[in-house]
Amino acid sequence: MSKQSLVSRKNDHLDIVLDPTRAIAATGTGFGAFRFEHCALPELHLDQIDLQTALFGRRLRAPLLISSMTGGAARSAAINAHLAEAAQQLGIAMAVGSQRVALETAGDQGLTGQLRQLAPDILLLANFGAAQLVRGYGVDEARRAVEMIEGDALIVHLNPLQEAVQTGGDRDWRGVLQAIEALAARLPVPVVIKEVGAGISAAVARRLVDAGVAAIDVAGAGGTSWAAVEAARAADASQQAIAEAFADWGIPTAQALLAVRDACPNTPLIASGGIRDGVEAAKAICLGADLVGQAAGVLQAAMHSSEAVVSHFEVLIEQLRIACFCTGSADLAGLRQARLLQLSAC
């Protein structure tokens, strides 16, 4: 694919995701099926609740990840800078969007060591698509992606549905697991696998862990639907109809999280996919997540400034802190033991 086509596609994606009426799946995340048992006597000081955690040797002041969002369009440079500055100020993690354009063209879209300069202390994750592993990418490209941003780990994203409904998408996914296993064995940093909004099943998660993957982002249904995004940018009515049929496809985030945690009890898990506030983040942690990711929910703020991103996440962090307080949880370990009532099926 030409540089112009790649960049045009990334610009289309950004424009569509910025309009939630065009991209959000009607499928719920599943978190609405759960409600915390309220603790009317917490015996805690709200301001002393400890939200700290760690992953891959980096300390985080809160269990939050700015999820992979944008990596191709020229305007991504400002967005990524705003996100990095905010992540550093807040002490949370950040994953960049796909680095394919930066790896295959002369442009970097802000995906350089400057991100590390802006955020010297954060957990920073590089990213490219799994389909590229059977189209020529290997350890060298993975190293370049990580070194480009001075990252701590590499996300390899699984997006077979998006590729299947996308005009010109990658249709041959044979050999992807074997390529992931080879990459995990040879890359000197951890490999994280994530979906992009259709979820990861228990069976797939188990195969990934057996292949040497260090962590999994379940990235379930309920947030951005990339099938809906591709329907919105389809080249013709037939392609649009094909994509629209899958707009609600996927495993809801809560259901995926429960299943993968049961199948992989010792694997670090990230919950993303439609998590809108700190109460849902608290539910995700109680259900087994180590970190909670958010992407589209902060994109509008990221278009404006790092201060807007900080304000957005300060609200979410305070919501998470109050959820801990009102469940009698002094820290994240306590939150994982809180009583979560299931009111209905996910």
Swiss-Prot record:
Belongs to the IPP isomerase type 2 family. Its cofactor is FMN; NADPH; Mg(2+). Its EC number is 5.3.3.2. Homooctamer. Dimer of tetramers. Mg(2+) binds at residue 163. This is Isopentenyl-diphosphate delta-isomerase. Pfam families: FMN_dh. Substrate binds at residues 9-10, 98-100, 162. FMN binds at residues 67-70, 98, 127, 194, 224, 274-276, 295-296. One of its GO terms (cellular component) is cytoplasm. One of its GO terms (biological process) is isoprenoid biosynthetic process. It comes from Stutzerimonas stutzeri (strain A1501) (Pseudomonas stutzeri). Keywords: Cytoplasm, Flavoprotein, FMN, Isomerase, Isoprene biosynthesis, Magnesium, Metal-binding, NADP. PANTHER family: ISOPENTENYL-DIPHOSPHATE DELTA-ISOMERASE. It is found in: Cytoplasm. GO terms for molecular function: FMN binding; isopentenyl-diphosphate delta-isomerase activity; magnesium ion binding; NADPH binding; oxidoreductase activity. CDD domains: IDI-2_FMN. Disulfide bonds: none annotated.
